[in-house]
Amino acid sequence: MAAPLGGMFSGQQPGPPQPPPGLLGQASLLQATPGVPRTSNSTLVDELESSFEACFASLVSQDYVNGTDQEEIRTGVDQCIKKFLDIARQTECFFLQKRLQLSVQKPEQVIKEDVSELRNELQRKDALVQKHLTKLRHWQQVLEDINMQHKKPADIPQGSLAYLEQASANIPAPMKQT
């Protein structure tokens, strides 16, 4: 169905990769986790991949298409999904453990990553603020245009004496002589 994950990335050698330096002797994705039954050459990644494929296989299985009981189909799919979720949790736990080990061994690396994430978040939020300011300016201009349209008819007096009324309003009042 799908190609194995081992050959998906360029430059990756087939076969099990070596654990990172400093982590020798510790459980890795290539070694079985204590307390979890595994086949001799199986890894968490392999099991995650096979359980993912099993989820899809159970959904498109010819047995189910040929009219198997709906409850039986549901049970089979539920079992496949539960297995996939269980292995996904184990994989997540593995990476969380590695993250914890990294934070203990190289705390400055974790701080650098946090600072980088905060900078990226600030840039994203600044861009969002600029986007909203642009929209705000646009709508302010729209409102100003609407207000100007409403004021224009009121500024121009109507009727036969309108011109005289407007002209006389602009003439300054005579000054009183004392």
UniProtKB/Swiss-Prot annotation:
GO terms, molecular function: actin binding
Compartments in which it is found: Nucleus; Cytoplasm; Membrane
Parts forming coiled coils: 109-145
Major location (coarse): nucleus
Sorted UniProt keywords: Actin-binding, Activator, Coiled coil, Cytoplasm, Membrane, Nucleus, Transcription, Transcription regulation
InterPro entries (alphabetical): Mediator_Med28
Keyword Zinc tagged: no
Span list, region Disordered: 1-25
UniProt cross-references to Pfam families, sorted A to Z: Med28
Subunit structure: Component of the Mediator complex, which is composed of MED1, MED4, MED6, MED7, MED8, MED9, MED10, MED11, MED12, MED13, MED13L, MED14, MED15, MED16, MED17, MED18, MED19, MED20, MED21, MED22, MED23, MED24, MED25, MED26, MED27, MED29, MED30, MED31, CCNC, CDK8 and CDC2L6/CDK11. The MED12, MED13, CCNC and CDK8 subunits form a distinct module termed the CDK8 module. Mediator containing the CDK8 module is less active than Mediator lacking this module in supporting transcriptional activation.
Family: Belongs to the Mediator complex subunit 28 family.
Protein's job: Component of the Mediator complex, a coactivator involved in the regulated transcription of nearly all RNA polymerase II-dependent genes. Mediator functions as a bridge to convey information from gene-specific regulatory proteins to the basal RNA polymerase II transcription machinery. Mediator is recruited to promoters by direct interactions with regulatory proteins and serves as a scaffold for the assembly of a functional preinitiation complex with RNA polymerase II and the general transcription factors.
Protein name: Mediator of RNA polymerase II transcription subunit 28
Gene: MED28
